[in-house]
């Protein structure tokens, strides 16, 4: 099986459509379908900050749950939206406010439909996907080699947030260790979460979050070809959101 793994979309629907078309997908049915049966995989954070979060929920639900032609691994923004939909006490900030504003503008019956779809998508998706006979792993923020095969709370924190130290930068963002430099496995780990200006290949890992919602690019990785394909963002460039190249 061949896959096209898509970086953090964050509600950037037009960029997602442009990227999938560039990757050879046809939208004539209203969904991106590849003529050669390639499958999409999402590294999570499909909502928040961008303009079309609810439409992205509908599309990913259709592909993953209804048609079963794609894979989705939830990100930290997905986890927070899930908790919001469950009625938990979450802070509506850091991008969630845009998704909530879209949601609250809907009539109640459409709100219920979106809520049910997202809860189903989240609950029926694993923390990470191991594909191609363990040659490929798709997750949101990365994973340590010794965590592969586990699904416990420690692994959940890692795949959603990265290798956080518990410390904070001056801007309040968490300090993260560079786990990819320590990764020695042969399984390719494809992930996002931390925006980089260009796809970052380190050992057998690839970060494909190229900051679409911050004016960078939306990137996909073609597997097993290991080729990256990107389209430019239509949003303003916010340079301080990108990790320095190292």
UniProtKB/Swiss-Prot annotation:
Enzyme kind, highest EC tier: hydrolase
InterPro entries in UniProt: Ap4A_hydrolase (IPR050126), Bis(5'-nucleosyl)-tetraP_PrpE (IPR023937), Calcineurin-like_PHP_ApaH (IPR004843), Metallo-depent_PP-like (IPR029052), MPP_PrpE-like (IPR041780)
Cofactor(s) required, per the database record: Ni(2+)
Keywords annotated in UniProt: GTP-binding, Hydrolase, Nickel, Nucleotide-binding
Pfam families, per database record: Metallophos
Catalytic activity field: P(1),P(4)-bis(5'-guanosyl) tetraphosphate + H2O = GMP + GTP + 2 H(+)
Entries under CDD domains matching the protein: MPP_Prp_like
EC id: 3.6.1.17
Hydrolase recorded as keyword: yes
SUPFAM superfamilies, per the entry: Metallo-dependent phosphatases
A GO cellular component annotation in the UniProt record: cytoplasm
One Gene Ontology MF term: bis(5'-nucleosyl)-tetraphosphatase (asymmetrical) activity
PANTHER family: BIS(5'-NUCLEOSYL)-TETRAPHOSPHATASE PRPE [ASYMMETRICAL], METALLOPHOSPHOESTERASE
Biological role: Asymmetrically hydrolyzes Ap4p to yield AMP and ATP.
UniProt similarity note: Belongs to the PrpE family.
Name by which UniProt lists this protein: Bis(5'-nucleosyl)-tetraphosphatase PrpE [asymmetrical]
